[in-house]
């Protein structure tokens, strides 16, 4: 087997650090899983036996690789990692979408992926410049949810819009916005929630592309964390009865 490098964006593979993310990779993308790395001290830890069983079932090689795990995770307490081939998906045109415009934090993106999956959204788009979807930090923050989602990265928002021209857009921003509780009442069958960069938010032109939405809060805070705002928005739109 070829040696493994510390993660770089130009590699054709990446890592899913952690026992649970590794299991998610094996369960939902077994054809993309190249091998599984396990720490010598992982024996007896919750999930280790199941991870080995899943690897055996998928015909994936399991290796003991303490040094490699420390190198790719940057931590000494990483007990497993799946090595997987990067993949491409297309969002389902009939399903609800979430678009993240220029997100800059891997932890936020991973959290949003996990939240989206948990609330029933399986289609996500990222607009460049943005975090690396396959960075192990993103994969780990998603707790492996990435492997159950259809995620595509676009160079421009216009590219996404041209691919899905018949969708109602809901950019989360203050300009020309209505409260979230009002926006969900007119939710059509096909819709997309759009969230901006952690620091800059969405450019002003997004207000004219759809119905701008705001999450109302009291005056004691000036804004909400991107992951929290996305979670609130996704929850309200998914739980509202059309």
Language model features by range: what are they?
Residues 23, 28, 82, 117-119, ...:
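Structured adenosyl-cofactor binding patch, chiefly the S-adenosyl-L-methionine
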């Amino acid at each position: 087997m070829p040696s493994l490098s510390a993660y770089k964006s130009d590699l054709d593979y990446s890592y899913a650090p952690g026992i649970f993310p590794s299991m998610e990779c094996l369960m939902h993308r077994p054809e993309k899983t190249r091998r599984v790395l396990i720490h010598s001290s992982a024996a007896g830890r919750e999930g280790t036996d199941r991870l080995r069983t899943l690897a055996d079932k998928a015909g994936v090689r399991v290796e003991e690789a303490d040094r490699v795990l420390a190198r790719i995770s940057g931590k000494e307490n990483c007990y497993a990692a799946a090595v997987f081939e990067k993949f491409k998906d297309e969002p389902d045109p009939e399903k609800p979408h979430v678009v993240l415009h220029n997100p800059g934090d891997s932890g936020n993106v991973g959290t949003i992926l996990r939240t989206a999956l948990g609330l029933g959204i399986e289609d996500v788009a990222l607009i460049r410049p943005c975090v690396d979807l396959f960075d192990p930090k993103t994969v780990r923050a998603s707790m492996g949810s990435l492997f159950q989602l259809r995620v595509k990265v676009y160079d421009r928002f216009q590219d996404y819009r041209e691919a899905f021209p018949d969708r109602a857009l809901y950019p989360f921003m203050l300009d020309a916005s209505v409260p979230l509780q009002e926006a969900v009442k007119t939710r059509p069958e096909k819709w997309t929630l759009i969230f901006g960069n952690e620091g800059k938010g969405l450019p002003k032109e997004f207000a004219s592309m759809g119905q701008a939405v705001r999450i109302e809060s009291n005056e004691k805070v000036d804004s909400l964390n991107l992951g929290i705002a996305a979670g609130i928005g996704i929850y309200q739109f998914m739980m509202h009865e059309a």
